[in-house]
Amino acid sequence: YKIVRGAYMEKERERAKEKGYPSPICKDKATTDANFNDCLTYILHHLNDISIFIGTHNELSTYISMELMQQLNIDKTDNRVWFGQLYGMSDHISFNLAEQGYNVAKYLPFGPVKDVMPYLIRRAEENTSVAGQTSRELSLLKAERKRRKSN
């Protein structure tokens, strides 16, 4: 399973309306985060039955994942657990996970521009609102550029 937060909100709302059931979208970010972390915990406790792709740009969820894996004695290289971020976003998370030996992938959406652009805009908007991570990520990118120039 691939777990993500907020990636399919419009589709889920439309589907719920079409099928006549209440929207499954959480009322606020705190509830969304709690749901994400609960799903993460459940899946990591049931890896014999489920594999997981943890699609997150959220540092706290990444730390929670790493802590749970350690507590449950799940090896960093276990092929049933992968982390992923959108190409060009949260590179500091991807780099540090890979540096520590975790399975990491960058994903790159593709398809017709009319389908891909709204998705990318949503991702960018969501990531600028993640507790000031955008300015922090920019400073990390500048530091990395400086490091590369000096080597």
Description of each model-found segment:
Residues 1-151:
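Positively charged, amphipathic and often flexible ligand-engagement surfaces
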